[in-house]
Regions:
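ABC ATPase NBD coupling module
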Residues: 87-105, 135-136
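Helix N-cap at the start of a conserved alpha-helix in ABC-type nucleotide-binding domains
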Residues: 194-196
Length: 232
């Protein structure tokens, strides 16, 4: 049985005549003046241990797909089956979403670190706040994850004191801290200078060798050819 299967994922974005007006406001639903079908019945299967790279140009819907899979966007239609449990991507309730997110992690293109927190605090925030883990236990996990990405000596540094590549490695450490079964990567190196890309790819290569399941969206064809990825 596949770890992750998605079937029939659809998502459209609509433009309305009056900015800010959305369906259901003031008692009736306005009709969109234009629509853009971003996802048109996407199907995908990911096996445990796979590294799947979704390649495409900017604006092709790659990031939208990833955000729909983690309920950062609501799809118009589609199902996601994870470890045998099915989720309706258009209608899942909060409890179902929370249950799924405990098994997944998301690495953002622009890191999404808290600017006022240290590297270690960024890694442990979710463990302490969302999972109610004791601080000393969370810190132990956080330091282990920072060591894994080669940044144990930067635990007390703030994002402004780190390079882009280091910030993205902190973001990967944060993802790993939640012990996910799969990590979604949204263009993880596209915001980096070429000389910093290698350090992030090295961490991802290590994770692939350890059997971490990863779904990566990117427009950089060459960068991911050594991650044992199959492309779609």
């Amino acid at each position: 049985m596949a770890m992750l299967e998605i079937r029939g994922v659809r998502k459209s974005f609509h433009t309305y005549a009056k900015p800010g007006v959305r369906p259901g406001i003031f008692g009736r639903a306005p009709k969109p003046v234009s629509s853009l079908d971003v996802l048109r019945g996407v199907d995908l299967t990911v096996e445990k241990g796979d590294v799947v790279a979704i390649l495409g140009p900017s604006g092709s819907g790659k990031t939208t797909l990833l955000r729909c899979l983690n309920f950062l966007e609501t799809a118009d239609a589609g199902t996601l089956t994870f470890d045998g449990e099915a989720f309706d991507l258009a209608r899942a309730d909060r409890a179902s979403i929370a249950r799924l997110r405990r098994k997944t992690a998301f690495v953002f293109q622009n890191y999404n670190l808290f600017r006022n927190k240290t590297a270690l605090q960024n890694v442990t925030e979710g463990l302490i706040v969302a999972r109610k883990m004791p601080k000393n236990e969370a810190n132990a996990i956080g330091m282990k994850m920072l060591e894994k990405v080669g940044l144990a000596d930067r635990a007390d540094y703030y994002p402004r004191q780190l390079s882009g590549g280091q910030q993205q490695r902190v973001a990967i450490a944060r993802a790993l801290a939640s012990d996910p079964e799969i990590i979604y990567f949204d263009e993880p190196t596209s915001a980096l200078d070429p000389e910093l890309t290698g350090e992030v790819l090295a961490v991802m290569r290590q994770l692939a060798q350890e059997g971490m399941t990863m779904l990566v969206v990117t427009h950089e064809t060459v960068s991911y050819t050594h991650l044992r990825a199959h492309e779609t």
